[in-house]
From Swiss-Prot:
Organism taxonomic ancestry: Eukaryota, Metazoa, Chordata, Craniata, Vertebrata
Composition skew (Polar residues), residue ranges: 608-628, 1338-1350
Residue ranges for the DNA-binding region feature of this UniProt entry: 482-569, 828-915, 983-1070, 1113-1172
Stated name of the protein: Homeobox protein cut-like 2
Organism: Mus musculus (Mouse)
Gene Ontology MF term list: DNA binding; DNA-binding transcription repressor activity, RNA polymerase II-specific; RNA polymerase II cis-regulatory region sequence-specific DNA binding; RNA polymerase II transcription regulatory region sequence-specific DNA binding
């Protein structure tokens, strides 16, 4: 192979060498030519010499040169021309001499000319030579260049060819080397193969030889081989014969095995066929069973309905006969057993929820009684039954229902199952308190008892009544216990935290679930508490609560198991309890229905006067498997039932009120007997038949109500009918009434329930809509003052119940408001989850953006990350590296990236930034920067109050419409101007001394006891934190941007306003009023309008344009119509943290901006939180037991838990001012129409439901919606207060500030007698006055009295509660009727966990019912809810 290649290369090399030789030869020839070419140098030299010689003659004077030339020419033959010339020049005829011709002048001339010609010719020749030489030289040079380039090209070619040759030679050499190595290997392999062949041959030979040997030597019996050669023929034959025999035997064996194999195959085939037949038969059976199951899919519903029906029947039978309640009802127990399994989870969850929220004392007591009785397992309730026949009996069903909403309570179906009613009450202060409260509340009617059990989840109705009378004393104990319980013992916080962590680890319960259901805290807070528990002595009262709850949680294994169940069921989705599944799917509706049924059953389990109605309703539901049909059946039946009941109730209300009910006097010893009896009757009707009573009020106007309102009312009525409507409804109604107003939108169902229960609450006009309705009924009732008293009592009772609700919200709302953010989309996950992120840089950017936009970490955590402030702070300060984060741990960082890039959507992207303004803006104009100077004049204050109100309410978008419009009315146009104006002022302002300004501002604020929050919100439009920062660390003027200078300009303007302090105080009052109004419905919109200071409606008139403009400097406030607010509230019920889609839908349907909707939700949530806080502080009513459970000691009247009202600050705690100013209006109003007053009061309460925004709806139908406002502005507000805080104001002891307000009767009895609506109004008015009074207004608002009215009242069953005097107000910690307890009451301001639980239950049930109605009216839903 190589040879030919080498030859070809050789040929190429030879050719190349030839070409190179040729090139060299050509080059040499060129060189030779050049060398041979004549040298131009000598010719040049000759030319030069000639030139020299020519030039010489001209310089030679001697003529020598001429002679030489002449001689030279002489030598040369003379040219003819010369001769001719010579001849011509001698015309004379002289002939030259023969030999010598001497030159003459002519000759010289001739020679000169000749010489010159010759020279010229020579020079020409020389030039030509030069030219030719130059041309030849150039050509030669060009040739040389060409030859050089050719030489170079050939050399490069040669080098290239050599290189290629070398490469190819190398490659060929490599190939040859490879071939040689392969050849060597092949040779080696061939050698190995040969060796193998040889070895194989040897083996073959050995094998052959061995075979031969084997053949030759068959084995003998001994196995010895005989050599073949030695074998004889006969032996070989014998061996062969033996082999043949062996072969035959083996063949036989093989045949037998084949036969057995065939048999086995046949048998197995038969067996397989049999099994297949059996399988087919069983699959058919399974299909049939599945069909049956599908056909009986509603079995659970039917079962639960049947259990409810049984419970209701028992309850209805037992309602009239408390004795029956005392005896365990086997059927009821059975029903409950049946009911509980289905409800187990429901119960467990509420129980958990409730238990965490209970006070330690209450928790202990309740848990002891309820929690310990395995609350969660359905079976557990029965044991309580045996212990306490009462509890198992209808009470249990009631509790069961209550369980749904309030787990723990429910579980201990009988609050004191193990103890005798008396023992238990005494033993469990809280329980007794609650149980007694309810028991007392209903003790008289017996129906009510059913209610308390529902609420108290374990109160024995029968014993409760009995106990309720003794209750007074237990109440005192409970209160004391309530106050002291937590402090009684020093807890080892480290040990408790350790045990809790152990339990959580052991049962795989997440801290989030534990915090959500047990402590009511976020995961971050729980983690902090468990990781670093502080010593008990260093904890505040609030700080001790989690440890008390943890201790109670650890006290019963059932709590842990229940929580584990919740963790398992809710793994991964803890949402606010009020969140509901989307209405879209039938499954969701079904689940809502089932939950609602269970909740209703559990809540109303035993006591419904309208049990038949409720029964029919459940049946309807069961019968129609489709959720909508079921709901509609329920609603239809409820409507029919209620209409019938309404008629009866109306008659009863007019007539029964006339009858005096003996129990009522015990309940309200102080009320006038006649009015008392009537009132009691009303109360009982409302309580015992409360459902019907309140429902009647509601129902009268059913036709007038919107579909939503109607459905809600019906559902409430159904609930009331199912359970002891009166008790339940009242409880709810009062709770709702009190809270729903404040929470106007907490849930339509809540408010509506309040509406139906409005009457018990004294808010016959439970809601705006209901209010209108209720007034009619009440108008009729109003005819009798006794009825009014009854209503008042109902209100009081309701307040008691309602009060419970307040706490409910505190416990409930926080969790409801727990940050929930929409989940990340799969695209977002994919985009960011696996992309490496620098968490340090990301958190730095987030912190910068938060700081730049003034967004607090709490809001950022809630809106963007779905985390608590603690978690956000921890994450931003110490971010883990991305690689160390789990998928869950990366989510917050993904959300941060999305937020930074504005990809989270308006809801989250904007919310955080806007929230600060909204949330920070607080009640005063958040965005409209109340002008610095705007410190409003009184009217301005009013306006500002409206501002504050509207701002605050705008936060919740619930400002009363009148106010909103008024406050806005003045400001809207000016706000834009104002914004421009303040900015111009800032731009043109001379340099200010920021330090001195802030110093003066601090001095003014401290001297006048004004809070930074109020100042910031009303004057600067900033949050308290921003104001504190500005005042403590003011930057120099030159370092501030225009925006940063604005607050200092505003401060300067405010300092220059002579009325700045008064305006701020007025604003504070207005703000408090607004807060009260919104929060507790204490001040009706009307009341605000009526009070001069409250004239938020004429804010603009009094405001100076500049102030107005300043106040509006930021943005005009958005005023929402009542319908819009209602729709937003309903949407909030369904989705407190709406998704972007929901926000857009709402904005589209309501024709609002998305920012407006977002801000409304944010503000409303903030308001809910504040209210919850206030409720928490207010949960302990200060009632004077001596005055009656409802009576607050005068001292307590103005207890000032300033913290309770968000607006109250240090300034809030001023000596109460006399609130008699309002008495005048009260008096006239009362005189004018006591009946109306009541109606209006109820209306107002109804209004409260709607919040500030819809007062008009509440008016008497006759009057028109505006009537209540106008007529009862004050009374309404006051009435609200009185209703809310009947204790303080209605208490037997007259209000010190408003002595005239109390009836002599009240004073005498020491009870708040509501016999006179006037007195009631006056009390309420007095409360209003006190509210108005700046000193007390905050305190009043937050004061337990108000609280009482607001939350304590309900809790204590407010002074008005129908509960027996002995019965401790449900809420009053010190239930002892004696005045001594009043003092005790005073100290204990803790939230009553029982009330909280009640509220939670109510909220749960309300939300479920609300969802239910939503599902029922899905077609109409779009108009009013989302």
């Amino acid at each position: 192979m190589v040879a030919p290649v080498l030859k070809s290369f050789q040929a190429e090399v030879v050719a190349l060498s030839k070409r190179s030789r040729e090139a060299e030869a050509a080059f040499l020839s060129v060189y030779k030519q050049l060398i041979e070419a004549p040298d131009p140098v000598p010719s040049f030299e000759v030319a030069r010499t000639l030139d020299d010689r020519l030039q010489r003659p001209s310089f030679d004077p001697s003529g020598q040169r001429l002679q030489d030339v002449h001689i030279a020419w002489k030598r040369c033959p003379e040219p003819p021309s010369a001769r001719e010339q010579n001849e011509g020049t001698c015309p004379t005829g002289h002939t030259p001499a023969n030999g010598n011709h001497l030159p003459g002048p002519e000759d010289t001339l001739v020679t000169d000319t000749l010489l010159q010609k010759n020279e010229a010719e020579r020079q020409k020749g020389l030039q030509e030579v030069h030219i030719t030489l130059a041309a030849r030289l150039g050509e030669a040079e060009e040739k040389i260049k060409v030859l050089h380039s050719a030489l170079k090209a050939t050399q490069t070619e040669l080098l290239e060819l050599r290189r290629k040759y070398d490469e190819e030679a190398a490659s060929k050499a490599d190939e040859v080397g490879l071939i040689m190595t392969n050849l060597e290997k092949a040779n080696q392999r061939a050698e190995a193969a040969q060796r193998e062949v040889e070895s194989l041959r040897e083996q073959l030979a050995s094998v052959n030889s061995s075979i031969r040997l084997a053949c030759c030597s068959p084995q003998g019996p001994s196995g010895e081989k005989v050599s073949f050669a030695l074998c004889s023929g006969p032996r070989l034959e014998a061996a062969l014969a033996s082999k043949d025999r062996e072969i035959l035997r083996l063949l036989k064996d093989a045949q037998q095995l084949r036969h057995s194999l065939q048999e086995l195959e046949e048998v197995s085939a038969n067996q397989i066929a049999d099994l297949e037949r059996q399988l087919a038969a069983k699959s058919e059976a399974i299909e049939k069973l599945q069909e049956k199951l599908e056909a009986q899919a509603d079995y659970e519903e039917i079962k639960t309905e049947l259990s409810i029906l049984r419970a209701m029947k028992l309850a209805s039978s037992t309602c009239s006969l408390p004795q029956t309640l005392a005896k365990p009802d086997d059927p009821l127990l059975v029903a409950k057993d049946v009911f509980f399994p289905t409800q187990k989870f429901l119960l467990e969850k509420p129980a958990l929820l409730a238990s965490p929220e209970e006070d330690p004392s209450e928790d202990d007591s309740i848990k002891g009684s309820l929690g310990t009785e395995p609350p969660y397992p359905p079976q557990l309730p029965p044991p309580p039954g045996p212990e306490d026949p009462l509890s198992p009996s209808p009470a249990q069903p009631l509790l069961g229902p209550s369980l749904g909403p309030d787990g723990p309570r429910t579980f201990s179906l009988s609050p004191f199952p193990s103890l005798a009613p008396g023992e238990r009450l005494a033993g469990d202060s809280l329980l007794s308190k609650h149980m007694m409260g309810p028991a007392a509340f209903k003790g008289e009617t017996g129906n009510l008892l059913a209610f308390p059990p529902t609420f108290y989840g374990g109160a024995k109705p029968p014993s409760a009544p009995a106990a309720s009378v003794p209750c007074p004393e237990p109440t005192g104990a409970p209160e004391a216990v309530d106050g002291a319980g937590p402090e009684e013992e020093q807890l080892d916080t480290a040990e408790i935290a350790f045990q809790v962590k152990e339990q959580l680890l052991k049962h795989n319960i997440g801290q989030r679930v534990f915090g959500h259901y047990v402590l009511g805290l976020s995961q971050g807070s729980v983690s902090e508490i468990l990781a670093r528990p502080k010593p008990w002595r260093k904890l505040t009262v609030k700080g001790k609560e989690p440890f008390i709850k943890m201790k109670q949680f650890l006290s019963d294994e059932q709590n842990v198991l229940a929580l584990r169940t919740i963790q398992v069921r809710q793994r991964g989705s803890i949402t606010p309890r009020i969140r509901t599944p989307e209405t879209g799917s039938d499954d969701a509706i079904k689940s809502i229905l089932e939950q609602a049924k269970k909740e209703i059953e559990s809540q109303k389990g035993g006591e419904s006067k309208n049990s038949p109605a409720s029964v029919s309703i459940p049946n309807g539901t069961a019968s129609s498997s489709t959720s909508e049909d079921a709901i509609k059946n329920i609603l239809e039946q409820a409507r029919r039932e209620m209409q019938a009941q309404q008629q009866a109730l109306l008659e009863m209300e007019s007539g029964p009120r006339g009858r005096s009910v003996p129990p009522s006097p015990p309940e309200r010893p102080s009320p006038a007997t006649a009015s008392q009896n009537g009132a009691l009757t009303c109360v009982k009707q409302e309580d015992g038949g409360g459902g019907s009573g309140s429902s009647s009020t509601v129902q009268a106007p059913l036709a007038v109500l919107s579909p939503a309102a109607f459905v809600q009312r019906i559902i409430r009525k159904v609930k009331s009918e199912i359970g002891d409507a009166g008790y339940f409804d009242h409880h709810w109604a009062s709770d709702r009434g009190l809270l729903s107003r404040p929470y106007a939108s907490v849930s339509p169902s809540l408010s509506s329930s309040s509406s139906y229960s409005g009457q018990p609450n004294g808010r016959a006009w439970p809601r705006g809509d209901e209010a209108t309705i209720a007034p009619e009924d009440e108008a009729a009732m109003g005819e009798d003052e006794a009825p009014r008293v009854g209503e008042l009592k109902a209100e009081a009772g309701a307040p008691e119940v309602g009060g419970g609700r307040l706490p409910y919200y505190p416990a409930y709302v926080p969790r409801t408001l727990k940050p929930t953010v929409p989940p990340l989309t799969p695209e977002q996950y994919e985009l960011y989850m696996y992309r490496e992120v620098d968490t340090l840089e990301l958190t730095r950017q987030v912190k910068e953006k938060l700081a730049k936009n003034g967004i607090c970490q709490r809001i950022f955590g809630e809106k963007v990350l779905g985390l608590s402030q603690g978690s956000v702070s921890d994450m931003l300060s110490r971010p883990k590296p991305w690689s160390k984060l789990t998928q869950k741990g990366r989510e917050p960082f993904i959300r941060m990236q999305l937020w930074l890039s504005d990809q989270l959507g308006q809801g989250q992207g904007q919310a955080p930034t806007q929230q600060p303004s909204a949330s920070q803006a607080s009640p005063t104009e958040p965005t409209s920067s109340p002008s610095p100077p705007p410190s409003p004049t009184e009217p301005e204050k009013t306006s500002q109050e409206p501002l504050g109100l509207s701002l605050e309410s705008s936060k919740e978008n619930q400002q009363p419409e009148g106010r909103a419009s008024s406050s806005l009315g003045g400001k809207p146009f000016s706000s834009s101007q104002a914004a421009g104006g303040i900015q111009e002022m800032v731009a043109m302002s001379p340099e200010l001394d920021t330090y001195s300004i802030t110093k003066r501002v601090k001095e003014v604020l401290t001297d006048n006891n004004l809070g930074q929050r109020l100042f910031g919100e009303s004057i600067l439009g900033l949050t308290q934190g921003s104001v504190s920062d500005l005042l403590s660390r003011p930057k120099p003027w030159h370092k501030l941007s225009l925006k940063g200078r604005e607050p200092f300009v505003r401060m300067q303007l405010w300092l220059s306003d002579p009325h700045n302090v008064e305006k701020l105080r007025d604003m504070k009052k207005l703000e408090k009023k607004a807060y009260l109004k919104r929060r507790y419905g204490l001040i009706g919109t009307g009341s605000d309008s009526e009070s001069p200071a409250a004239h938020s409606e004429c804010p603009s008139p009094c405001l100076q344009p500049q102030e107005l403009s300043l106040m509006q400097a930021k943005k005009p406030r958005v005023v929402l119509a009542p319908a819009e607010k209602e729709a937003l509230r309903k949407a909030y019920q369904l989705e407190p943290y709406p998704s972007q889609q929901t926000i857009e839908l709402l904005s589209f349907q309501l024709n609002l901006k998305t920012n407006t909707v977002i801000n409304w939700f944010h503000n409303y949530r903030s308001r809910m939180r504040r209210e919850m806080l206030v409720e928490g502080t207010q949960d302990d009513p200060d009632f004077d037991p001596s005055g009656g459970p409802n009576v607050l000691t005068p001292g307590h009247t103005h207890r000032e838990p300033t913290p309770q009202s968000p607006d109250s600050e240090t300034e809030d705690q001023k000596p109460p001012m006399k609130s008699l100013e309002l008495q005048e209006p009260e008096g006239p109003l009362q005189r004018a129409a006591p009946d109306r007053a009541l109606v209006k009061i109820k209306q107002e309460e109804g209004l409260e439901v709607d919040g500030d925004s819809q007062p008009q709806d509440v008016g008497d139908p006759d009057r028109g919606q505006d009537g209540p406002k106008e007529e009862h502005t004050h009374p309404l507000g006051n009435s609200d207060l009185s209703e809310l805080a009947p204790g303080p104001f209605l208490s037997g002891t007259p209000n010190p500030d408003c002595p005239s307000l109390h009836n002599p009767q009240e004073k005498g009895t020491g009870e708040q007698v509501h016999s006179e609506p006037l007195s009631f109004k006056s009390t309420s008015e007095s409360s209003c006055c006190s509210l108005e009074g700046p000193p007390n207004s905050p305190s009043v608002i937050s004061s337990p009295d108000l609280t009482t009215c607001v939350s304590p009242a309900p809790s204590s069953s407010a002074p008005i509660s129908p509960s027996l005097p002995g019965a401790p107000p449900a809420k009053v910690p010190s239930t002892s009727p004696t005045g001594d307890t009043a003092a005790a009451l005073h100290p204990s301001t803790k939230v009553n966990p029982n009330l909280q639980r009640r509220h939670e239950k109510m909220a749960n049930l309300n939300s479920i019912i609300y969802r239910l109605e939503r599902a029922a009216n899905r077609e109409e839903v779009l108009e009013w809810e989302f």
